[in-house]
Structure formats: C-alpha cells, structure tokens
C-alpha cells in the first residue's frame, strides 16, 4: 500500500455524486488520515455497478485494507451490487432518511437525479443561477461598470486577493449576482472610492490579505517584479484597508480562509439569503 495514503475512499452515486462527495468529505475531515478519493457518478445500470464493485475489490486485494464507500443510489438492484463489494459501505442519504421517515410519518419517494437534476419545478431557479453566473463573468475585475446597481454584492480589493474565485463561487453555488472591482498600483497615489461605486456603498464588501501571502501569489505570476515585491504589497494592502475604514466598508482578511468560508462570511455579514440548487 502507498505509505502516503491511509485509506482509499469512494464516492458513488446514480447522479452527479456531489452529495456523496460533500457529505463524505465532511465525515472524513474528522479523522487524521490521508485519503485517496475516487468519485464515480452516474452508476445507473448493473453493468457499471459491477465494474465499480470490481474496482473497489481490486484496491482491497492490492492494499489489504477495506476501501471506504460513501454512496447514494436509488435503485435497490444497483445498491445490492455495491454492497457485495469488499468496501465498507455507507448509504449517506438513507442514514438521515430513516429517522426522518419515523418523525414525519411519511414514506420517502426516492427519484434518481432529484437533488441536482432539472425538472419543471426548478427551471426558474436554474435560469436565475445561470443569469447570476453570466452577470458575474461580465463584471469580473472591473471589466464593466454598467448595471452595477443590479449586483447583490460588489467585492473590492487589490489584485490577487481572491475577488474572482469568491465572486464565481457566490454566483455558481448561491446564485448571487456579484461584481468585483480591483484597486491597482496606479490607484495608490490617491486612493479614493470611485464615483461609480459611491451610490452603491451599501453593496460594497472589501477583501484584504496578508502582504507576505500576496507577494508569494504575485511572484508566481510575475517573478521578480515590482508588482510582486513585498514592499509594494505592504503598501497596497495598507492603503486599501485605510480606504475600507474611512468609508466604513465591511471587510475580511482572506489569507487563512477557503473560498467557501469567504463566501459564507460575505453572505452572513451582508445579510444575503442563501439559495440552494
């Protein structure tokens, strides 16, 4: 067995496997182990299920350690094949459905692809999500200042502090129309809030970052440049943070947070409603 890997983990579903991945990853993060993840979506027929079973069994025979299998599968005949494998199998949805069934006195009606599939009941939500993504792409990095009033939040910050990935995550995960505006080196001699943003101050949210981390990120993009120098990064961060304080713009330091955590903090601080897709 590879000494760098403590356990092999399978995420298996008859749909996208997103649910299995998210819940399985949340569970595995509780343990101090290194894992090798294998995600297998759209296991919808017996032939594919047998191939998945063989893959699980092969790893068991190769390593001598049972793979961990997190699965979400509707059809019982497909589930039965997976359960015949040498893996330690956990039905992540059924573990929650069974007690809820008792509490609500209702029988579940499982349907494949219900969680992330399209149907007449969620088309409007899906269209709104795509519109949010289109808007966010069109308003990335100050590309366009038109229709800024349609943004639900406008992120500010120096170059490479995490504005773009956070904006896209907000749009894709929560359907939030997000614009972002960069403060560049040329702005620093007289840094003020642009006139186009002043009427929208209630929508502004600032990101900052530790100068040392910013310099390391920029160094990968433009090696040995003034843009990436620690001195330049310190100056830009100090100026932008002063701007936030002066204009009472809420802000967070993104250095030690993941994109998911940054986005969630923005939603919470700005009072934006989370939308589930």
Curated annotation (Swiss-Prot):
Picking any one GO molecular function of the record gives:
protein serine/threonine kinase activity
Q: What is its EC number?
A: 2.7.11.33, 2.7.4.28
EC class, as a word, reads transferase
Protein source organism: Shigella boydii serotype 18 (strain CDC 3083-94 / BS512)
Q: Which reaction does it catalyse?
A: [pyruvate, water dikinase] + ADP = [pyruvate, water dikinase]-phosphate + AMP + H(+); [pyruvate, water dikinase]-phosphate + phosphate + H(+) = [pyruvate, water dikinase] + diphosphate
Keywords for this entry?
Answer: Kinase, Nucleotide-binding, Serine/threonine-protein kinase, Transferase
Residues the entry annotates as binding ADP: 157-164
- Determine if Nuclease is one of this entry's keywords: no
Gene label: ppsR
User: Please, which domain of life does this record's source organism belong to?
Assistant: Bacteria
Sum up the protein's function in the record's words.
Answer: Bifunctional serine/threonine kinase and phosphorylase involved in the regulation of the phosphoenolpyruvate synthase (PEPS) by catalyzing its phosphorylation/dephosphorylation.
Q: Where are the transmembrane segments?
A: none
- Family classification: Belongs to the pyruvate, phosphate/water dikinase regulatory protein family. PSRP subfamily.
Which InterPro entries does this entry report, sorted A to Z? Kinase-pyrophosphorylase, PSRP
- Please state what the protein is called: Phosphoenolpyruvate synthase regulatory protein
